[in-house]
Structures are given as C-alpha cells and as structure tokens.
Amino acid sequence: MSTLKKPDLSDPKLRAKLAKGMGHNYYGEPAWPNDLLYIFPVVILGTIACVVGLAVLDPAMLGDKANPFATPLEILPEWYLYPVFQILRVVPNKLLGIALQTLIPLGLMILPFIENVNKFSNPFRRPIAMSLFLFGTFLTIYLGIGACLPIDKSLTLGLF
C-alpha cells in the first residue's frame, strides 16, 4: 500500500494547472532533495549567523572578581530553588523541613488513586486534582516570593 495520493488526471482543474506548469506542488513537495539539501542548511546557517552576530554585537560582560573574604549578607540559591529554600529557612527543625519536601512527590504519586477518572476526561471536571494543583501552584509562588524577602517579613510578604 502506498502512502502517496495518486493524482486524479480526469479533474479538469488539475489538468489546467499541469498545462500551465503549476501543479507540481499540488500533492506536496518531496522531502528529498528539496528540504534536506536546500531548506535545512539555510536554516542551520541562518541560526549560526544569528548566534555569532549576537555574540559579537553584545558580548557578555564579566562580573566582579570573586573575593572569598567578603561574603554577601544573605546568599540566595537559583530562582527555581526559592520555594525549597523558603521551607528550609522557615521550619525550625531541619529534619521536619526535609520531611515536608518529601510529601510533594508522595502527594503526586497518590493523586491518581484519589480520583479514579478517565485520563482523557476534561481536567475542569476533576475538582480534587484541580484544587490540589491550584493550591500547590499558589503555595509555590508564595514561598518563592517569600524567599526573596528578609526572614522576618518572609511569611507575611511584608504586608502585615
């Protein structure tokens, strides 16, 4: 069985296009050699030219030299670790902080067993999963913002 669509040469519109030399792209353009030999190298070379051009026109500036004898007042981790950092910073017992972080993957593993629904169903018709997802999202954003603030203002976000 062929995957190519056979042209209907009895179609007068197609015959008129073929007579004018316009019908060769009517059923698709072949990948070999058109895409692989002509289009892909142009895209690859264009991407390389853009990267090299941006590197030449806007080089990255070097930061201050490292001084091991002058540490900053508060060392912050990368932005994606802010919620975890906030949990470890706020919880008084560090072992409890690590235990709280293990609840996140455990909750994600238990979630499919809480709501036994079809995986193709509408997610808005799954109230438990949606409420847990929204709670986790807002908690992560709240903890991430709190990690950027001093510890005395981190839980209230400086609002109270």
Curated annotation (Swiss-Prot):
One Gene Ontology term, aspect cellular component: plasma membrane-derived thylakoid membrane
Protein keywords: Electron transport, Membrane, Photosynthesis, Thylakoid, Transmembrane, Transmembrane helix, Transport
An individual GO BP term: photosynthetic electron transport chain
PROSITE patterns: CYTB_CTER
Localization in the cell: Cellular thylakoid membrane
Membrane topology: Multi-pass membrane protein
GO molecular function: electron transporter, transferring electrons within cytochrome b6/f complex of photosystem II activity; electron transporter, transferring electrons within the cyclic electron transport pathway of photosynthesis activity; ubiquinol-cytochrome-c reductase activity
Subunit structure: The 4 large subunits of the cytochrome b6-f complex are cytochrome b6, subunit IV (17 kDa polypeptide, PetD), cytochrome f and the Rieske protein, while the 4 small subunits are PetG, PetL, PetM and PetN. The complex functions as a dimer.
Function, as annotated: Component of the cytochrome b6-f complex, which mediates electron transfer between photosystem II (PSII) and photosystem I (PSI), cyclic electron flow around PSI, and state transitions.
Protein name as annotated: Cytochrome b6-f complex subunit 4
Organism: Prochlorococcus marinus (strain MIT 9312)
